[in-house]
């Protein structure tokens, strides 16, 4: 019997965890058997709905947007990761996407549900510095950008796993989802028409990773700028070299380097994928590592 809103919030998170725990092995089985992953998408979609209900209930329970402590931000990140996964799968409904992305949402909600003590899972009043309309603008955009960058980087990791030293042609782009068109000469009339050519699995992953990371990078930029404006309003300084700020800048630079290699150098395949995987590690340090230090304005506190 669920007697309190807190118990219902945690139960919704646990239910989403169970669904993702079921979805992950099914996704890997679908990849190995080369079958469709419709059931996996259904499980992830229902889990996302449960996370949505969890966040709404937590918002009602606490009286503020549910992103003010580590538990709430992990639940929000799980919601954003599963939503990003569903959007990417809509562009390319392959079980490889589910196999690559589902572990991230699962890891976030598992950490929130099982690794954090009850006092960090409980709702608490906002500290005065966070009682600002910038909270929703800055933190939510940063968290959604993390979700897009994490999912995009996991797709890059999938490129490294599926790549067998294949050379990718420079024919995929950030626009389009399933293939490209090339000029083909028609023998009987000599006219030129556009003929659709399907991308390989590796090219699809490479293109989807690039597009997802591009969206995440743009949102990260907006999040950092909005945070600087908020900091200036609250403390009179745009930048204070707080540990989280420093690592957010490092994260931005890593993904800026990734996009530079794609746009200016024309890299595709393994080389930019390696840069994206470095970004995956940097996000982990920026998001979780800073909290282990227990210092800085952005730290959610020491929890060990």
Swiss-Prot record:
Positions of disulphide bridges: none
A GO biological process held by the record: cytochrome complex assembly
GO CC, alphabetical: plasma membrane-derived thylakoid membrane
Pfam family, one: Cytochrom_C_asm
Keywords assigned by UniProt, alphabetized: Cytochrome c-type biogenesis, Membrane, Thylakoid, Transmembrane, Transmembrane helix
Record InterPro entries: Cyt_c_assembly (IPR002541), Cyt_c_biogenesis_CcsA (IPR017562), Cyt_c_biogenesis_CcsA/CcmC (IPR045062)
TM segment ranges: 11-31, 37-57, 63-83, 96-116, 141-161, 212-232, 246-263, 275-295
Main localization (coarse): membrane
Membrane topology: Multi-pass membrane protein
Gene Ontology molecular function terms on file: heme binding
Localization of this protein: Cellular thylakoid membrane
Lineage: superkingdom: Bacteria
Record bears the keyword Membrane: yes
Entry keyword Oxidoreductase: no
Family label: Belongs to the CcmF/CycK/Ccl1/NrfE/CcsA family.
Subunit (UniProt): May interact with ccs1.
Primary role: Required during biogenesis of c-type cytochromes (cytochrome c6 and cytochrome f) at the step of heme attachment.
Annotated protein name in UniProt: Cytochrome c biogenesis protein CcsA
Organism: Synechococcus sp. (strain CC9605)
Gene: ccsA
């Amino acid at each position: 019997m669920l007697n309190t809103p807190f118990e219902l919030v945690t139960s919704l998170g646990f239910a989403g965890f169970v669904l993702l725990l079921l979805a992950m092995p099914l996704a890997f089985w679908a990849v190995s058997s080369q079958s469709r992953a419709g059931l996996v998408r259904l499980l992830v979609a229902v889990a996302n709905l449960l996370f949505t209900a969890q966040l709404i209930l937590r918002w009602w329970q606490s009286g503020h947007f549910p992103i003010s402590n580590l538990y709430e931000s992990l639940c929000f990140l799980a919601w954003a990761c599963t939503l990003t996964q569903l959007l990417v799968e809509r562009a390319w409904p392959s079980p490889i996407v589910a196999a690559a992305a589902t572990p991230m949402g699962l890891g976030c909600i598992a950490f929130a549900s099982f690794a954090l003590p009850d006092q960090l899972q409980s709702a608490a009043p906002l500290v005065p510095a966070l009682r600002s309309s910038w909270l929703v603008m800055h933190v939510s955009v940063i968290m959604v950008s993390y979700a897009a960058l994490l999912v995009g980087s996991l797709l890059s990791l999938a490129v490294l796993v599926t790549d067998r030293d294949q050379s990718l042609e420079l024919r995929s782009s950030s626009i389009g989802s399933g293939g490209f068109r090339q000029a083909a000469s028609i023998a009987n009339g000599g006219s030129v028409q556009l003929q659709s050519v399907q991308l390989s699995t590796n090219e699809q992953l490479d293109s989807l990773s690039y597009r997802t990371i591009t969206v995440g990078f743009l949102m990260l930029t907006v999040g950092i700028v909005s945070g600087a404006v908020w900091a200036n309003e609250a403390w009179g300084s745009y930048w204070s070299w707080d540990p989280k700020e420093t690592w957010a800048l490092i994260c931005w630079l890593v993904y800026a380097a990734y996009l530079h290699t794609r746009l200016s150098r024309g890299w595709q395949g393994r080389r930019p994928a390696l840069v994206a995987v470095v970004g995956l590690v940097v996000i982990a340090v920026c998001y979780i590592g800073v909290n282990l230090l227990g210092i800085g304005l952005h730290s959610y506190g020491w929890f060990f």
